[in-house]
Amino acid sequence: MIIEIITIFPSFFKSFCETSIIKRALEQKKVQIKIHDLRIYSSNKHNQVDDSVYGGGVGMLLSFPPFFDCLQKIKTPQSKVILLSPQGQIFNQIHATNFAQKETHLIILCGNYEGVDARILQYIDAEISIGDYVLTGGEIAATVLVDAITRLIPGVIKEQSYLEDSHQQGLLKYPQYTRPQNYFNHVVPTILLSGNHAKIRSWRQKESLKKTLQKRPDLLENKKLTLEQTKLLKEIKQELQK
């Protein structure tokens, strides 16, 4: 997987690429991350890449030519071009999984100021937002996408690790505990110490459903449940009504 990021703040990504899973994925060559400074593609002697908005308006807009010229240089037939924008689809685990499994070359455009010249949109394959709020620039959102996608690339982390993550199976993750077993009467559920893997699996399934029902019931609306999950969910609802 090659991920290329077009930004006016290339130094923003330095520490990100030198930390944790991203650093390991780069060292193991599971992913390549290339940062492109948009200002290099400016024809202005001051390397300016923004300008005032035609028709009037507050703020500055990132110009079309630098984005266009950069894309002309790095885009290939295999590229998937993503614009980070508050107007885009809300990014979720399904997007992350699809990008990790189906794409080999992602180009991420980071917007700033009032956004980008609308002419760039005809070269975009997807507009993505990380939430219904506005950030100063797309750089923070870019790190969210890169992190979420990279950890799903085969070989970056153990498959079992992400298969049990919240949202990967359409449910929130069950509660987890570690040592000590008892601390000032705050105890770990005894079933987790039983060694009975079937009961532990069932407990985790039930707790996952319970947490999802209580915190994110919207996730259950379109979730296709197994017969076991349907039975457990019915039990949970009955217990909560008592």
Curated annotation (Swiss-Prot):
Matches recorded under InterPro entries: Alpha/beta_knot_MTases, tRNA_m1G_MeTrfase_C_sf, tRNA_m1G_MeTrfase_TrmD, tRNA_m1G_MTases_N, tRNA_MeTrfase_TRMD/TRM10
Catalyzed reactions: guanosine(37) in tRNA + S-adenosyl-L-methionine = N(1)-methylguanosine(37) in tRNA + S-adenosyl-L-homocysteine + H(+)
GO cellular component, one term: cytosol
Binding positions for S-adenosyl-L-methionine per the UniProt entry: 111, 130-135
Keyword flag Ribosomal protein: no
EC number per UniProt: 2.1.1.228
One Pfam family named in its UniProt record: tRNA_m1G_MT
Any one Gene Ontology BP term: tRNA N1-guanine methylation
Keywords: Cytoplasm, Methyltransferase, S-adenosyl-L-methionine, Transferase, tRNA processing
Domain of life: Bacteria
Subcellular localization, as worded in the UniProt entry: Cytoplasm
Function: Specifically methylates guanosine-37 in various tRNAs.
Family: Belongs to the RNA methyltransferase TrmD family.
Assembly and oligomerization: Homodimer.
Protein name per the record: tRNA (guanine-N(1)-)-methyltransferase
Source lineage: Bacteria, Bacillati, Mycoplasmatota, Mollicutes, Acholeplasmatales
